[in-house]
Design a protein with these regions (language model features):
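Periplasmic N-terminal accessory/gating domains of Gram-negative outer-membrane beta-barrel systems
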Residues: 1-5, 15, 39, 78-89
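A beta-strand signature from Gram-negative outer-membrane beta-barrel systems
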Residues: 1-32, 91-93, 106, 112-117
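Short, surface-exposed loop/turn motifs at beta-strand boundaries within globular domains
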Residues: 12, 89-91, 127, 210-212
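Membrane-embedded beta-strands of outer-membrane beta-barrel proteins
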Residues: 17, 96, 130-132, 215-217
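Surface-exposed loop/interface segments of Gram-negative outer-membrane beta-barrel transport/assembly proteins
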Residues: 25-78, 118-123, 129, 133-214, ...
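Outer-membrane beta-barrel channels and translocator barrels
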Residues: 26, 91, 102-103, 139, ...
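Outer-membrane beta-barrel initiation region
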Residues: 45-47, 84-88, 98-102
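An active-site-proximal structural segment forming one wall of the substrate-binding cleft
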Residues: 219, 227
Length: 258
């Protein structure tokens, strides 16, 4: 129903599978605990030319355009930027629930925690969920109850791989002497950063915290033999908060030393 789907936000636009825990029988209380974890990786990277091949092809382009060749003095790296930004990600999902029932009352309480570490370094996502439902049987044919689903989500500060497949391999990742990430050569540094600047130094520059809650209260009345009347009041609440800042970044330029 919409109140259960609401906590998934846009992720639930194409539908979700909701697993309903079996309710306890009258006089029973059930406790269910389950957890899972896994790993994820990028199985196939985009094949890129190495530094020597890049220098040859770039200078060939300049010659064909009638321009002088680029002086690669000081640019001695041979970096595969995809190797630098990617990592093996980690996923875990954990849930605990308690359900119980008597002749006049049934309840369900569940909580969950999900955490995902992305395939790009410093990319992570987490979600805490809470589900509560209660139903009271006032008479043999009249029941009242409520349901609530809530979630606190810390979305990932997502990064793209575009820079990693565009950046020249001739730049080294880091200059140990000055303790700085290396900038890209003149023909690229105005267009993009060293990919690790975006992945590492700009990590967590966007901080978001989202809350979602939905619920309903209802009353059900069975009358005659095959008829039921149900009245329901529903609510849906969402709060999305985000902050972004631009850090001051220093980088090392191999072509401007001294």
């Amino acid at each position: 129903d919409p109140s259960s789907l609401a906590i998934f936000g846009v992720r639930g636009a194409n539908g979700v599978i909701i697993i309903t825990t079996k309710k306890a029988k009258v006089g029973q209380t059930r406790v269910n605990i389950n957890g899972s974890f896994g790993f994820k990786s990028v199985p196939n990277q985009i094949e890129m030319v190495d530094a020597a091949g890049f220098k040859e092809l770039y200078n060939e382009q300049l010659r064909n355009e009638g321009n002088p060749e680029f002086d690669f003095t000081g640019w001695n790296g041979n970096t595969n930027w995809q190797d630098e930004i990617f990592q093996t990600g980690f996923i875990t999902n954990n849930n605990v629930s308690i359900t119980g029932a008597s002749e006049k009352h049934s309840f369900y309480l569940g909580a969950g925690y999900a955490y995902e570490q992305g395939n790009i370094k410093n990319e992570k996502y987490s979600k805490i969920t809470l589900s509560v439902s209660n139903e009271y049987k006032l008479t043999d044919n009249f029941r009242v109850g409520f349901q609530f689903n809530g979630a606190r989500i810390l979305p990932a500060d997502t990064k793209t791989v575009t820079t990693a497949v565009r950046a020249t391999p001739v730049a080294t990742v880091f200059n140990d002497q000055y303790g700085l990430y290396t900038t890209l050569p003149e023909f690229q540094k105005a267009q993009m950063n060293n990919p690790m600047v975006d992945v590492d130094l700009k990590a967590n520059t966007t901080r978001a915290e989202n809350y979602r809650g939905s619920g309903n209260v209802y009353a059900e009345w069975d009358f005659l033999k095959h008829f039921q009347f149900k009245a329901m009041f529903s609510m849906d609440y969402a709060s999305n908060n985000s902050r972004k800042f631009t850090p001051i970044i220093q980088v090392y330029d191999a072509s401007a030393e001294g």
